[in-house]
């Protein structure tokens, strides 16, 4: 299995739905023996330029380990979800588990809570 990093930009009006989206995508990944190593909810942030006449978006970062088949399925889900403004899937060489610079500027308690959540999801397998 390969390691991937996914960044999602969700429509700001759908910010309340982000946790359900993450849960849905997490089950797709974990049901196919994939593992989520890092999950960060960066919250609503200002865009550097308007996308679809929007100036803000809700950002989510996911680092995971999964097969190509799972990534193809996940890519299809991301493409056809109207709430997702943009998504980027990158293949990375190594597992990344430490907090990103975007989250380091926020409260460290939030980071540990998110990491605990992803560890609980992975331990359920």
Curated annotation (Swiss-Prot):
One example of a Gene Ontology biological process annotation: translation
Gene Ontology cellular component list: cytosolic small ribosomal subunit
GO function terms (MF aspect): small ribosomal subunit rRNA binding; structural constituent of ribosome
Stored Pfam families: Ribosomal_S6
Superkingdom of origin: Bacteria
NCBIfam families: S6
UniProt name for this protein: Small ribosomal subunit protein bS6
Gene from which the chain derives: rpsF
